[in-house]
């Protein structure tokens, strides 16, 4: 067995009663007033009013910031940090999906000097952020459990990350009831993000017995409940499975990184403003197929967890069956299978930049050395082109 380390400091609270969960979180942190950050989409939903009502009923003071953008930029995040510094809030609550939670984490600027660009990379944050409570309203990004902030840099037109233990949420509040009546597209998009975290971590070279155990349980919950939850958004058991699966899958990603689905996806999503889950839905089958031979034992195990009859199959055949099943799940969820339909074009210059990002992410940062098969620049460009055109994976 190889040496490994496992990092987890976030306190997870699973509570189907939002008011009760918030009261517990406030008591643990000993705080009085929160800046709550969300995006206009969530602010238009009934759960936003439920959140404010719950805060009032427990006498938890708050200010609101409702201007979070999807795929938040450095500009938006710094505006949020400035808004926080202008208040007397002693804690921050991120309420929403990964964008709201990452923007809430960017409150680090309230206790650290300079701009976000000063902290790109790992372990550059010097001071602890204000206490944070992350209340997720989607089951996908798992941003509430990571030490990372994903940022679209407006100058570089690519996604950057800040990584630091100081960026870990103090409390992650998981309330499945908040997922009720989630739009089908949001649920499918977020769920595929969780699936990609799980699978890329499981087959990665940094995987260890702890992350493997989590991954198998997460994979079981997602393949059992994602499609059901998309089709039956009021199913509280399916919602519980998915909110936990997303949370747990990111425990994997935050410890051992992801793979080339994320490495290529960060370049495409940041450059063309496509949601992270959708980007991964298009890319993941291609990346799994690229790795199928070196990752055959683990992908074969995934096939069995999915209920695929692997009797009489070789390990490689079972692994290939798993890849095809993941592709079929993507299609059953009615997620996009190509980038071309977004009206985007990929030029030779774009392909070089995609290869630059993927190559860099394979060498630097949380996912460095994690991909099971070492890809070349030409491999990355070929995967991007196949994904752009929606080439169907086959064996």
Regions found by a protein language model. Give the residues of each.
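Glycine-rich phosphate/diphosphate-binding loops that line cofactor/substrate pockets in enzymes
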Residues: 19-35, 53-58, 86-87
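Conserved beta-strand elements of the Class I
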Residues: 35-36, 91-93, 133
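N-terminal small/polar loop signature for handling phosphorylated ligands or for N-terminal nucleophile
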Residues: 43-115, 123-124, 228-239
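A glycine/threonine-rich phosphate-anchoring loop and its flanking beta-alpha core
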Residues: 110-207, 298-305
């Amino acid at each position: 067995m190889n040496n490994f380390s496992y990092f987890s400091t976030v306190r997870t609270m699973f509570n189907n009663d939002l008011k009760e969960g918030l009261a517990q979180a406030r008591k643990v942190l000993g705080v009085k007033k929160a800046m709550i950050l969300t995006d206009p989409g969530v602010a238009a939903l009934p759960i936003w009013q439920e959140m404010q009502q719950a805060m009032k009923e427990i006498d938890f003071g708050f200010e609101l910031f409702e201007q979070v953008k999807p795929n938040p930029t450095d500009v938006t995040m710094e505006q949020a940090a400035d808004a926080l510094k202008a208040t007397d809030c002693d804690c921050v609550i991120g309420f929403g999906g990964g964008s709201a939670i990452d923007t809430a984490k960017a409150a680090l600027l309230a206790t650290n000097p300079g701009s976000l660009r000063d902290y790109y990379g790992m372990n550059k944050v010097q001071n602890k952020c204000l206490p944070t409570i992350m209340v997720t309203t989607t089951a996908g990004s798992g941003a509430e459990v990571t030490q990372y902030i994903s940022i679209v840099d407006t100058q570089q037109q690519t996604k950057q990350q800040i990584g630091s233990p100081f960026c870990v949420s103090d409390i992650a509040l998981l309330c499945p009831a908040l997922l009720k009546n989630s739009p089908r597209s949001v649920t499918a998009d977020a769920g595929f993000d969780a699936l990609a975290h799980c699978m890329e971590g499981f087959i990665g070279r940094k995987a260890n017995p702890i992350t493997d155990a989590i991954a198998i349980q997460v994979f079981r919950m997602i393949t059992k409940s994602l499609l059901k939850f998309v089709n039956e958004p009021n199913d509280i058991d399916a919602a519980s499975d998915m909110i936990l699966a997303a949370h747990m899958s990111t425990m994997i990603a935050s410890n051992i990184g992801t793979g080339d689905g994320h490495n290529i996806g960060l370049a495409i999503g940041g450059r063309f403003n496509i949601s992270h889950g959708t980007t991964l839905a298009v890319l993941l089958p291609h990346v799994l197929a690229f790795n199928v031979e070196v990752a055959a034992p683990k992908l074969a195990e995934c096939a069995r967890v999915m209920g695929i009859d692997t009797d009489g199959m070789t390990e490689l055949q079972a692994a290939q069956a798993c890849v095809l099943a993941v592709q079929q799940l993507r299609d059953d969820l009615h997620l996009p299978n190509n980038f071309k339909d977004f009206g985007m074009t990929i030029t030779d210059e774009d392909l070089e930049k995609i290869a630059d990002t993927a190559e860099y992410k394979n060498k630097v940062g949380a996912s460095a050395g994690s991909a099971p098969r070492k890809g070349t620049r030409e491999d990355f460009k070929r995967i991007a082109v196949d994904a752009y055109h929606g080439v169907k994976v086959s064996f």
